Amino acid sequence: MNNNLHKTVMDELTQDGDSAFRKYQDIYVGTRSISSLVKYELLTSLVSPIPGAIGFFLRRLFYKKLFAKIGDGTVIGPYLTLRCPDRISLGNNVFLDDNVTLDAKGEESHIIVGDSILIGKNSSLSCSSSEIHLGNNVSVGSNCYIRASRAPVKLGSYVTIGAHTVIISGNPSYKRLDIPMMKQKGKARGIAVGNDVWIGIGVKVVDGANIGNGCVIGAGAVVIRNIPDYAIAAGVPARIIGSRKD
């Protein structure tokens, strides 16, 4: 491949030569093992939709066979969407609400979730050849989207994320006109959020914008640059309007 071109997960999954069945295994299961495919199909098709206490018990019992790790006290709600679950680790006392998506497509992708985590209804953690790492005591509100594309997203401990927040690492390059932007090698820097951080409703955090320890990010802010420790930031783009130390 031309050194100026970036090979995406989509390239890997849509390339010629592999059968549709093999591509399905790569996208959904993450391995071409037939036994892993059968296990994935049975558990996600039969156990995932079951509501109530019976569904909770069955998922708690059988989903350990899918994930790389599930800690003690974990609760998984119905209609969990899983992609490549053997690259996903859940710590102790994790609560996944209804309709959560955990997607670890791409050979280098991993999702690592710490202890005492709440992921709200309809929220999605998605990787593309990178890693999402949540520390301990993290609350992710409903309808949030956290995406790691070619660079990691790492959240510290005691982080609160309001509903409808979007955190996405990875940037396209648009310098070359002769190469489609999605094929160009961007300079993905990743996103790091420190400890004891409050992120309000509907915040957007873009690649390379790190948030320090103890920060407060106001609702609807768009964070495009680094926010120092204990700063209070708001606006579009986000600017510092105060400090918790004052």
What are the roles of these predicted feature ranges?
Residues 1-73, 158, 164-165, 171-177, ...:
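Terminal amphipathic alpha-helical/low-complexity segments used for targeting or macromolecular assembly
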Residues 63, 75-85:
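Long amphipathic N-terminal alpha/beta scaffold segment
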Residues 81-90, 95-207, 236, 244-245:
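Flexible, glycine/small-residue-enriched loop-and-beta-strand segment within the central core
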Residues 108, 211, 222, 239:
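Short alpha-helical
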Residues 230-231:
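Extracellular disulfide-bonded cysteine-rich modules/repeats
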